Amino acid sequence: MRTPLPALLLFLCTACLCTAGLAQDRSLTLYTSLAPTESGPLAQAFEKKTGIKVELWRAISEKVVQRAITEARARRFAVDVVETNAPEMEMMAREKLFAELDSPYLADLPAAAVPKHRMWIPDRMNFFVVAYNTAKVRREELPKSYLGFLDPKWKGRIGIEATDAEWMATLVKKWGGEAGLAHFRKLAELRPDVRKGHVLLAELIAAGEVQVGLTVYNANAESLKRKGAPIDWLPVQPVVARPQGIAVARNAPNPKAARAFVDFVLSPQGQELLVSMGRVPASTKVRTHLNDFEYTVVDPITVLDEQDKWNKLWEELFIRAEPKR
């Protein structure tokens, strides 16, 4: 049967209109704090799947925020997708840098980790776990909860990372004000070894300089373990989870490509790729031993709104009393 000419013309015009926008978006620019060894393969997998080229700029989270905000205020709209720590993502959302997100994979994410405004959504997680040197500490020695580390026998054996006030804030709120504060005052009396940098803390545990770390990212410990280092980790309860977020810039030059990239990262393929590189997926559909336990999610809004309060307390308890290194 012949197709009437007017109907054929209408179909062709509609197809052209639908693909015109996609045809223009043949590249996108990503700002991220994800290490090049992981962000690179993620970008390459997306390019292979879609043919859309990813221009990658990687820096620490503070520099990602600084560049994104500076460019937006100067009305230089260069970035399409931003990916970094949740508190920094919330900071940029408040500057109205992002567009509201919708994704077919939104339902796969833990509801507690998704902000109501959806200007950014979590794509991976950092879990604060207990890591230990397997040559110096037996797994059976470790307490089942953080309360057990108040035992004086752990004095001189435990370490924490220097910037983890959000971990403390989350646990204090979970345990209840006074009880939570009392716990951290007692922990401070044990004078834990304070080190700057989560990667460094994990490396010091593997080297035996710190026997047990209370605020180690499990992905960092897992990475060293896979390389044969004498380190392992345990999800001592309560486990605190800090989301890492991804967003499309409000004035993205390539919005369709940007949204396609976000969907790819959140898809089972993207999340499985993160797992293969030792990262923890945000998706509840992708299970791994790296996320197969209960956890409490850091509230990035609280981190921002109450950061002075918690940073001051953290400084008083753990930093000022610590000898200079």
Where do the PLM segments sit?
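A bilobed periplasmic-binding-protein/Venus flytrap-type ligand-binding module shared by bacterial periplasmic
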Residues: 129-136, 172-174, 242-257, 273
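Extracellular/periplasmic bilobal clamshell ligand-binding domains
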Residues: 288-325
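Early extracytoplasmic/lumenal segment of secretory-pathway proteins
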Residues: 24-90
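Periplasmic-binding protein-like
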Residues: 108-111, 126, 185-188, 192-195, ...
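A structural signal for short loop-to-beta-strand junctions that line the ligand-binding cleft
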Residues: 77-82, 99-130, 147, 157-158
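Ligand-binding "clamshell"
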Residues: 92-100, 111-118, 223-235
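Mature extracytoplasmic/periplasmic domains
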Residues: 240, 249-303
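Ligand-binding pocket segment of bilobal, Venus flytrap-like solute-binding proteins
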Residues: 157-237
